[in-house]
């Protein structure tokens, strides 16, 4: 069925291979849970990764200049993915890289692993995708089916939280398990 998307790759991944796409997001979430499970019990509730002191020099400059540009590029790649090359995973990877760059320079600290906002960012994408999939049972006759004529807006509504979840998950995988400050 026509999706209204100009990018055949996105159309295929979100309509005919939707279960694979859902499981891709779930795998990132499970990988983060796996990394977090490596932390000792005493570290639970701490922040992922080592605490980084503020940097000076080129790293600090790049960490101040690049994230706003990377944010725009990452979001553009997600938006452009509906009609051309790009999409949620590529955009999410760029957003994650910008967060990690700012963390490496000591400009931001990751939130504690028990933070509600962090957990919401991690599960929002898979949860929204699953809810849309269940709605497909009632509206389109099968799990993960999209209602005719509404494919593009529904796909974009799925990709927005998926991008957030993928970006958060990839960044947290790089930061590692939580630790308590000494």
Where are these regions (language model features)?
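Alpha-helical transmembrane segments of multi-pass membrane proteins predominantly involved
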Residues: 1-182
